[in-house]
Regions:
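Duplex nucleic acid-engaging cores and interfaces of nucleic-acid transaction enzymes
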Residues: 1-169
Length: 169
């Protein structure tokens, strides 16, 4: 955690030199120390209410709910054919369509996901973490932001939105 704080403070020093200070029986090399710090930063980003609210708002306003047909499925009567390759804005999708999409997904006919402007979201979060300041640690911060978004933040917010859409329907 001290190395994560050091990175987030946007120190000017050499991260490799700094990381050596945190080697011990559990952290055997510099790469492990840096990765551990980036994991902590990623988790902090994913838990940050500001980034969660931002992403949720952006996906509600501009996100697209997309469906795609699974290669193997039992929809011989083509009940869900309309949803084999379907997309609609999250903000405009109507209740009966949400329920039909959920049924098709539950019956393993389609995959469902929400898409948005990932590059913009990553840029916003990175600017927030760096407070818009220049830093030689930017590649590390970007790696933590990307990891947080892919592994933690986006899947969590996507589930929240899908759950809320279903509850509303």
């Amino acid at each position: 955690e001290p190395l994560a704080k050091w990175i987030l403070a946007l120190n000017k020093g050499d991260i490799l030199v700094e990381a050596k200070k945190y080697l011990n029986d559990d952290v055997l090399n510099v790469e492990a120390a840096i990765q551990g710090a980036l994991d902590i930063i990623a988790e902090d980003i994913a838990d940050d209410i500001k980034y969660r609210k931002f992403l949720k708002d952006m996906l509600y306003k501009g996100g697209i709910l997309k469906t795609s047909e699974k290669k193997k499925h039992d929809d011989e009567n083509k009940v869900y054919e309309m949803y084999y390759n379907y997309q609609e804005k999250v903000k405009t999708i109507v209740s009966h369509r949400i329920l039909a999409i959920n049924r098709a997904e539950k019956e393993k006919v389609i995959n469902v996901n929400i898409e948005g402007d990932k590059d913009y979201y990553l840029q916003y979060i990175t600017r927030g973490v760096t407070k818009n300041r220049e830093t030689n640690l930017l590649p590390y911060i970007q790696k933590a932001v990307e990891d947080s978004y892919q592994r933690l933040l986006f899947p969590s917010i996507e589930r929240e939105i899908r759950k809320e859409l279903t509850e509303k329907a």
